[in-house]
């Protein structure tokens, strides 16, 4: 009697309703945990794009309905487990189904890749990042785990991803919670992996990264003092009004903590790659209307700068435990 039902919980690509969709997803989660080879079978299935779209649909539904919080968490766990498969990135490079169970600005069904859909859904759910959210962390880790093999990212999804990094790098956000800096670190790992591994296969992504060189340079030039000063900046009082008391930083936001943050970010490596590519493009850009077309043609065949060493990033895996199991089935 306590089984959760939802009349909208069905696959739009078949006539079979999934009245017990939560139970079906728990079975999938259990199989992925118990059988490490099962994830490869799932991501290599010809129906993977349909399954992936349905999982994102449940996330989309759950974020709008507080009673489905456990379903949202379950979807995140399933995606994390799937992202540990070596073939997951290749699966994300596939085109999305011709019909999607939700509408997202920037997504073209049948043309956008599954990675584009994932990034644009993440962007729509977290268009204003004001506090730490475990779902955002799951999305970022899923992308980070697969980022070295991603190809064909669209201009729109690349722009949204880098815009998210801009929001995650705000000083006030970083000092809000000790976990927030981890979100920025993982997001930067995504950018670095794509730039290192798939330059020629992601011309739109590289183009957007070059356009945002100032953002990455600003993050790279952050110092403990500048972050702290920016986070507690006091606006000038208006005439006739007393200045507001200076906000207090949380206890964790020490200079030592920020030194650890700055050392964990790969942003300086990103800046080195971008600046090397910008030097190569100087002869292409001549201040003419055709510059963008010439630049895109160049980026389709660009090679990684040989003078910049490669940097490896860790695979972040899901850790199964009693607390997670209780949360999922709650």
Predicted regions and their residues:
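Eukaryotic scaffolding regions of large macromolecular assemblies
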Residues: 53-56, 63-330
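Alpha-solenoid helical-repeat scaffolds
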Residues: 1-70
